[in-house]
């Protein structure tokens, strides 16, 4: 994916949209959000 511009968390679903409008969905639990390093760490599937 290109730069992610939107993230929606619904229970164990994490939905992401990038700057080009592409969409991706993954399952897991958010463990850590590093806004300085631009990382989200998930645990699970």
UniProtKB/Swiss-Prot annotation:
<dbReference type="Pfam" id="PF10133">
    <property type="entry name" value="CooT"/>
</dbReference>
<dbReference type="InterPro" id="IPR019300">
    <property type="entry name" value="CooT"/>
</dbReference>
<protein>
    <recommendedName>
        <fullName>Uncharacterized protein AF_1733</fullName>
    </recommendedName>
</protein>
